[in-house]
Curated annotation (Swiss-Prot):
Coiled coil: none annotated. This is Myotoxin. It comes from Crotalus helleri. Cationic peptide that possesses multiple functions. It acts as a cell-penetrating peptide (CPP), and as a potent voltage-gated potassium channel (Kv) inhibitor. It exhibits antimicrobial activities, hind limb paralysis, and severe muscle necrosis by a non-enzymatic mechanism. Expressed by the venom gland. The lineage of its organism: Eukaryota, Metazoa, Chordata, Craniata, Vertebrata.
Amino acid sequence: MKILYLLFAFLFLAFLSEPGNAYKRCHKKGGHCFPKTVICLPPSSDFGKMDCRWKWKCCKKGSVNNAISI
């Protein structure tokens, strides 16, 4: 029975994250995920959280060079 629990846990973790689809919505907007402490310039290039991980946000790729970290 323990083997079944371990097998289920392994399968669950294996399919939990799909690396090919990470941040798909942000990338479709032409953005990239950055920590929330980064300020995107101009402000219109800040798309918000979208599908980025916790405490990260989506900024337009062109604003990467202009990003300011607090």
